[in-house]
Amino acid sequence: MRSAAIKRKTKETDIEVSVNLDGTGVVEIATGIGFFDHMLDLLARHSRIDMTVKAVGDLHIDFHHTTEDVGIALGQAVKQALGDMAGITRYASIHMPMDETLTRVVIDVSGRPMLVFRTAFSRDKIGEFDTELVREWFNAFAMNAGITLHVETLYGENAHHIAESCFKGLARALRAALAIDPRNKGEVPSTKGQLGG
């Protein structure tokens, strides 16, 4: 079973996460940020990754530290659960619609972290959640998971729909890229014989 648990504690946040990459999307999320919990719930359910996230942060200041640190911890958990990445499909490309919005998410589980994020929001906040934090979370996740991740919203108007299409797109891309390809016969999908360098 490809699973991992991470604890991260700083002066700003106290976070515990766990993932099972071969799960069914069983999810337990509690960050204290309603909209963010909703996005993480979508991520788990549509990726089919079993996911637990418990976070206590300095929400009296703002949501930045909690959002970013959850991205760091989840990224670290996914990377740890992947191990040497033997047998994975590695690549995936998804177009994710959400009503009037369409977002493209392309992923390479390469061990080389990179984020290209081309998404503009129609307003600064979704409820109390700053829309700029969507990029902050994706960056923290990609850097710590060690994945190359391209997220581009091709068009869209509603800020909630734009964010949701990004998270659902990532979920479906992870579901495809992390899947074990039986044709790989347990080999690392790289001509180098290893990923991450």
Swiss-Prot record:
It is found in: Cytoplasm. The keyword DNA-binding does not apply. Its EC number is 4.2.1.19. Pfam families: IGPD (PF00475). GO terms for molecular function: imidazoleglycerol-phosphate dehydratase activity. PANTHER family: IMIDAZOLEGLYCEROL-PHOSPHATE DEHYDRATASE (PTHR23133:SF2), IMIDAZOLEGLYCEROL-PHOSPHATE DEHYDRATASE HIS7 (PTHR23133). Belongs to the imidazoleglycerol-phosphate dehydratase family. This is Imidazoleglycerol-phosphate dehydratase. It comes from Bradyrhizobium sp. (strain ORS 278). The lineage of its organism: Bacteria, Pseudomonadati, Pseudomonadota, Alphaproteobacteria, Hyphomicrobiales. The gene is hisB.
